[in-house]
């Protein structure tokens, strides 16, 4: 089944989805991309009420706190969860922002999938050069401390139920990507890491998240400290 693209044609996607639900008996909608997850979250109440379907994603007020990378980093800072130094980036605060994060650093859009819009900058001149085009293309964003990582990434996958309990968790240690410099994981192992599970579950508790969430974690090479990078708010 082919449907309109939710990002480029949100109205047509909505019409398609509602027609499909009216004609097809569906019990649960499980969004598999950031775009569909955001749309389902924004329209969750209507879809569940009219079509009698359950949407496996929180309402948008909660969803947005995880999906928006700036809001997530601000939350981590408030509650003391490990994360890279991150600050809102605007045309007027480039010098102040870079003084906080230091160089090298990453320009990161608040809303993006994968590595889209992420730009590495190693000095203030480069930041001044590339920021306008990144902002024009991807919208609001942050400047984030560049993590010299160990070469290993972690995915922490959790399911928090409506009673605040963790119904399941998995920690995946990603050893290799394709392409090699960053992409889709192609060599991973499941590991036991209660520390990572506890850190990530505490974040979900603070935003009252219900359902599945997938954290991306880096490990700093020199200190061995973990850093929350983002949440993929979908299955």
Cite the ranges covered by each PLM segment.
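Active-site nucleotide/adenylate-binding loops and adjacent lid/helix of ATP-dependent enzymes
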Residues: 63-150, 160-165, 194-197
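A short, GP-enriched loop/loop-strand-helix hinge that lies immediately N-terminal to
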Residues: 2-4, 24-67, 82-85
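Glycine-rich, highly charged phosphate/nucleotide-binding loops
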Residues: 1-20
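Conserved metal-phosphate-binding beta-hairpin within the catalytic cores
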Residues: 205-235
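Active-site charged/polar residues at nucleotide-handling catalytic sites that mediate phosphoryl
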Residues: 23-24, 101
């Amino acid at each position: 089944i082919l449907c309109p693209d939710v990002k480029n044609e949100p109205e047509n996607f909505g019409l398609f989805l509602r027609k499909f639900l009216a004609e097809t008996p569906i019990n649960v909608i499980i969004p598999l991309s950031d775009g569909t997850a955001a749309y389902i979250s924004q329209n969750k109440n209507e879809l569940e009420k009219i079509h009698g379907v359950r949407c496996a994603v929180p309402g948008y007020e909660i969803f947005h706190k995880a999906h928006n990378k700036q809001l997530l980093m601000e939350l981590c800072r408030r509650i003391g969860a490990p994360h890279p130094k991150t600050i809102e980036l605007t045309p007027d605060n480039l010098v102040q922002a870079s003084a906080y994060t230091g160089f090298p650093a990453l320009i990161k859009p608040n809303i993006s999938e994968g590595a889209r819009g992420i730009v590495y900058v190693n000095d203030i001149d480069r930041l001044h050069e590339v920021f306008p085009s990144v902002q024009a293309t991807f919208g609001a964003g942050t400047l984030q401390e560049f993590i010299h990582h160990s070469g290993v990434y972690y995915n922490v996958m959790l399911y928090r139920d409506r009673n605040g309990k963790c119904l399941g968790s998995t920690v995946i240690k990603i050893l290799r990507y394709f392409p090699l410099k960053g992409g889709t994981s192609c060599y991973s192992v499941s590991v036991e890491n209660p520390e990572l599970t506890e850190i990530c579950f505490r974040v979900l508790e603070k935003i009252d998240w219900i359902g599945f969430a997938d954290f991306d974690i880096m490990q700093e090479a020199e200190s061995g400290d973990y850093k929350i990078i983002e949440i993929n708010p979908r299955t």
